[in-house]
Amino acid sequence: MKRLLLTIVCLLAVMVGASAQRLVIIHVNDTHSHLDPERTGEDVGHGGIIERAAYIDSVRNAVGKDKVLLLHAGDWNQGSPYYSIFGGDLEVSLINALKYDCLTLGNHEFDNGVEDLGRRVKGIKAPVVCANYDFSQFDMGRRGVKPCTIIRRGGLKIGIIGMLTDITKVVSYETASRIPRAGTDAEVVNKWADYLRNDKKCDLVIVLSHLGYDEDLDLVKETRGVDLVVGGHSHTFVKDLEYRTDLEGKQVPVIQDGCWGLNIGRIDVY
């Protein structure tokens, strides 16, 4: 498996001077129901759920489960016969088995409609976050999907905001027309970043995004209070962290892992 191993040193001001590793962020995106190793192409024999699980377990065993944050940036559904046959239920079982800490929605999560997605979301044990669409009229909004969440790992209080691509372009009209936006992308990120940073006193604020790589880069320039953007949707493999300057002049890193689970992102925070 190609593993994307990246290190962010002194990501937060409170960490400057710390010598011990505080946190490992493991992240994937756009796995698209690829549960088996690839059968063709240059990645033949690589990938698959077993290989991903083995790597995740190895990191947890090495640094301690309480120091690992496992994220998925959306589109865990659609892309192999497993989804066609089981309708996304198998992916939910595996998300729970791997013990993800947080996920955001991708557009392909809506392929069987918003009600069916709501049924599956309720089966996911980890928080599912999406801030730029309003699901309050649906059962999944009342009992499942929230704009953001707070997770404690490695002695840190971590706020995570979810973002979803423009569904009017990539989801059926029947579904997309029923789901109102909660504001512009920049508006909702600024709102929830302020809430997490100032009201909830989070040490680290992450945007878990399914907007696309270029959109993530642009988003940073219109927002404040965000420390890291973990992205998906465009299937972009980012070898090195790309930085953009936010409204306060801070350099914010943006990352994405390609697709199909062939790359696993790792960010070490000290």
Protein language model annotation of sequence segments:
Residues 9-18:
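Hydrophobic h-region of N-terminal signal peptides that target proteins for export
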